[in-house]
Amino acid sequence: MKTFFENQILHLDLHGIRHPDVEIIVQDFVLSHQEELPLIVICGNSAKMIQIVNQALTKIKVDFEETRY
């Protein structure tokens, strides 16, 4: 897990994180940095990872948009 600023936006890179750990990492990241919105979570191309992140954000009632690059 790596966090970094790019264009003054804080990013969380989930490459290398195991699926069972993703939910708590994402929720902690968002809740810990909610005063710095917007935030970006990088999931990679794994449909499962994207699904887990979407569910994690939905559980804590965070509005988000999914963007693919």
Give the positions of each predicted feature.
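Long, charged, low-complexity intrinsically disordered regions
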Residues: 1-69
